[in-house]
Amino acid sequence: MRKIIHIDMDCYFAAVEMRDFPEYRGKPLAVGGSRVQRGVISTCNYEARKFGVRSAMATGYALKLCPDLILVPGRMQVYKEVSQQIRAIFSRYTELIEPLSLDEAYLDVSDCKLFKGSATLIAEAIRRDILAETGLTASAGVAPIKFLAKVASDLNKPNGQCVIPPDEVPEFVKSLSLRKIPGVGKVTAEKLSSLGLNTCADVQAYPKQELIARFGKFGAVLVERAHGIDDRGISVSRERKSVGVETTLAQDIYTLEQCQQVMPGLIQELSSRLGRSAKGRQIHKQVVKLKFNDFKQTTIEHRSDEVSVVMFYELLSQAMARQEGRGIRLLGVSVGLAESKDTLAPLMVRETKQLDFVF
């Protein structure tokens, strides 16, 4: 059984604006549109939603619902940069990441060994990291299948989490509204309702072949979802440019020796990830990253076409020279990957015999 997490940022664009401009906090705010030009709301905060304002709503109508609505233009470059921060956090826990947009993604953490493999605790850790490093809140859904993870992430918003364990899936889907199933929009929901089909339990009791006759391929998918079946895997379509491992330390550390004690576990996990997601790819650099307790960070890299364990330790020493007495709260190692067309040979590892562990 897989362990799927769906992360959904809370009113993302609006949340970034409230973070950067505290004067907006506690007031109805929407991103997009203008008081003088026609437009559409991209997103709005929860204060605006109390008045009925929603995403994709015409700005003029939103202002009728909430005359005091604050409208701000979108800052897409900022939203993209923060989204990259968030995805970097995801990559600490798994390489199986399927971004759906700037503010949501599926993660398959089935092979993650952190927190003894508990997807619940992993989701909590991801949300903590996002809050600590971006100042934004995220909601999470945890389930053994994708569509239920997405459903679950919406149940305890904002800044909440919902877990649907495998043994609770059959009971959970029975009462689930068909409107919650991806692909069931307003028109389809009305057609289903005209047949007396409003919940998954209704579909379970309905003749499968009749649904397929009425709705075609979607009818078959609907039957599967209504029974808690979703065989879709995580779609990682883009070619990876790097593979890395980071760990946020339980307590700040201060010495090179303490950092060296953390390195073997990171390098071992990096080796595993390279084998899973970059087999046969040529590397072109090695990188060590430190984040300090003032949340500033430094990276040191070295161009190389072979993975050298000793080089990671040399880069660590160079990074520590920039410490300036600060505590270290995060340590990471990574390699940059050459494009597939540049792949000349399998990844090679050298100098491991000088160190007493397996790479």
From Swiss-Prot:
Annotated coiled-coil positions are none
Provide the primary localization.
cytoplasm
Q: What is its EC number?
A: 2.7.7.7
Which domain of life, per UniProt?
A: Bacteria
* Record text on cofactor binding: Binds 2 magnesium ions per subunit.
Can the keyword Lipid metabolism be found in this entry's annotation? Answer: no
Give the UniProt keywords, A-Z. Answer: Cytoplasm, DNA damage, DNA repair, DNA replication, DNA-binding, DNA-directed DNA polymerase, Magnesium, Metal-binding, Mutator protein, Nucleotidyltransferase, Transferase
Q: What catalytic activity does the UniProt entry give for this protein? A: DNA(n) + a 2'-deoxyribonucleoside 5'-triphosphate = DNA(n+1) + diphosphate
Q: Report one GO cellular component.
A: cytosol
Q: Which residues are tagged with the site Substrate discrimination?
A: F13
Q: How does it assemble?
A: Monomer.
Instruction: Provide the family line.
Output: Belongs to the DNA polymerase type-Y family.
Function, as annotated, reads: Poorly processive, error-prone DNA polymerase involved in untargeted mutagenesis. Copies undamaged DNA at stalled replication forks, which arise in vivo from mismatched or misaligned primer ends. These misaligned primers can be extended by PolIV. Exhibits no 3'-5' exonuclease (proofreading) activity. May be involved in translesional synthesis, in conjunction with the beta clamp from PolIII.
Name of protein: DNA polymerase IV
List the source organism: Shewanella sp. (strain MR-7)
The upper taxonomy is: Bacteria, Pseudomonadati, Pseudomonadota, Gammaproteobacteria, Alteromonadales
Quick one: which gene encodes this? Answer: dinB
